């Protein structure tokens, strides 16, 4: 947040600014995630999973950049509500369970599927503002994903889906390596039976890479905004450079950049099927 503030980006509301939709740390929003989890459980969409990552990797097909599609080892034959308080404390061979979303038991709300192009109820689709029409088969490409980890932490997919809705987000913009996550998060929102007109639009942008084609990442000790700031780079210089690289105006003025912005400039529209 300090880096973004240095770059000149401000927020309508947030951790520093405050606002009506707080708290703004996910660690302070557990009650909201638990409420969503309880609702999904009432529909029989959760089950405990005792598998380790090593066991899953040994038998599961690979799902793009986001790990493995769970093979359903612990999935029950029928989706029924769990006694969450009991199941969370029930160890098996010394392991406590994660809670997974039961994709097999999931059915789209009728109003949701009536507004999507696909007639196959095992296929999820949405329009990405950059990559065009996206589809994924729920069983083959999405699978049963974790909603709560075995250590009790609410998983990324659940937290992001709930936050994006409750913050009334109009757009979710993130890296193209998270396209599969969007299918999962939209599935959560559909299972929560939320109105389609209150679901965000999604845009996945290409990743920033170095000269060798490797994406910039902390683990690779790649350049960071903090490093540029500490070496004396001026924020207006960086803003102007980024604007030119992205085909914007030759200016460091954020309002000018925003006024010149259009999704159509970056649309690839090729679509993909998973």
PLM region spans:
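Active-site cores that bind ATP or allylic diphosphates and position pyrophosphate for catalysis
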Residues: 48, 54-216, 224-229
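Short, surface-exposed acidic
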Residues: 11-16, 196-202, 249-254
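N-terminal Rossmann-like or analogous alpha/beta NTP/dinucleotide-binding catalytic cores
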Residues: 1-65, 176-196
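Charged/polar, solvent-exposed surface patches and flexible loops
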Residues: 2, 35, 58, 76, ...
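Hydrophobic transmembrane alpha-helix bundles
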Residues: 13-30, 49-62, 84-100, 233-249
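Non-catalytic terminal extensions that flank enzyme cores
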Residues: 7, 86-92, 96, 106, ...
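Alpha-helix initiation and N-capping motif
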Residues: 30, 53, 67, 71, ...
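A short alpha-helix capping/helix-coil boundary motif
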Residues: 8-17, 165, 203, 218
């Amino acid at each position: 947040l300090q880096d973004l503030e240095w770059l000149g980006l401000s927020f309508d509301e947030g951790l520093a600014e405050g606002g009506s939709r707080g708290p703004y740390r996910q660690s302070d929003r557990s009650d909201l995630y638990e409420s969503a989890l309880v609702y999904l459980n009432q529909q029989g969409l959760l089950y405990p999973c005792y598998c380790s990552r090593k066991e899953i990797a040994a038998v599961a097909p690979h799902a793009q950049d986001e790990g493995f599609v769970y093979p359903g080892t612990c999935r029950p034959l029928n989706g029924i509500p769990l006694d969450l308080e009991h199941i969370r404390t029930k160890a098996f061979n010394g392991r406590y369970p994660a809670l997974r979303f039961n994709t097999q038991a999931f059915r789209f709300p009728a109003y949701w599927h009536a507004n999507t192009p696909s007639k196959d109820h095992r296929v999820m689709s949405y329009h990405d503002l950059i990559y065009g029409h996206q589809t994924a088969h729920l069983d083959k490409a999405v699978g049963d994903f974790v909603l709560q980890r075995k250590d009790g932490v609410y998983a990324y997919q659940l937290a992001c889906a709930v936050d994006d809705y409750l913050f009334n987000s109009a757009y979710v913009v993130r890296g193209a390596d998270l396209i599969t996550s969007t299918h999962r998060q939209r599935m959560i929102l559909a299972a929560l039976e939320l109105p389609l007109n209150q679901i965000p639009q999604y845009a996945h942008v290409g990743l920033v890479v170095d000269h060798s084609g490797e994406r910039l990442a902390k683990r690779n000790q790649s350049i960071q905004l903090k490093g540029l700031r500490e070496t004396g780079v001026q924020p207006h210089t960086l803003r102007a450079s980024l604007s030119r690289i992205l085909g914007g105006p030759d200016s460091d003025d954020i309002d000018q950049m925003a006024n010149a912005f259009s999704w159509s400039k970056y649309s690839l529209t090729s679509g993909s099927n998973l």
